[in-house]
Amino acid sequence: IRPPSKEKIRDRVLNLDEIKNIWAACDQMGYPWGPIFQLLMLTGARLREVSQASWSEVSIADGTFDLPASRTKNKRSHQIQLSDQAQNIIQTLPRIEGQTLLFTTNGTTAVSGFSKVKKRLDIISGVTGWRFHDLRRSFATHSTERLGISPVIADKILNHVTGQVRGVA
């Protein structure tokens, strides 16, 4: 019996042109997919953290997105400061009375079917060979390398426990 192979650590970081093309494709895709992926790029949050977000977790007045411990990978509550651009995206989302989720196609459950949507996004954007989690890694890399944010702060933004930006989980 062979031992299990080591899991390959992904290190794909999207360059700025790729991010720009994905952003433009998101504009074409519209609700719910476009805004989900744009918020991933702006916040560095995990796909499920954004796609399953509820209105009660977001405060435009405070500019925050409060994730309860039950919805984070490390089971620690996390507050994400929303940029003006992220707040504007959230403010433009359809708001239906009685609907608790930011992103839903049926009014009651969070969106699903990401692999199908990812294929569509690849076609529209012309960017291939990446995964949704690469948006998070790209956020971390560009924050530290281009914006000069300290890796310790980047880890806090990403709700990391370890203090390592590499191998973004």
What is the role of each PLM region?
Residues 4-7, 13, 67-75, 87, ...:
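Catalytic-site neighborhood detector that most strongly recognizes the C-terminal catalytic loop/helix
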Residues 13-19, 62, 71, 81-128, ...:
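Active-site/catalytic core of tyrosine-dependent DNA strand-transfer enzymes
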Residues 28-32, 95, 127, 146-149:
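Alpha-helical structural elements of signaling/regulatory helical domains
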Residues 57-64, 128-129, 148-169:
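Short, polar N-cap/turn motifs at the start of nucleic acid-interacting alpha helices
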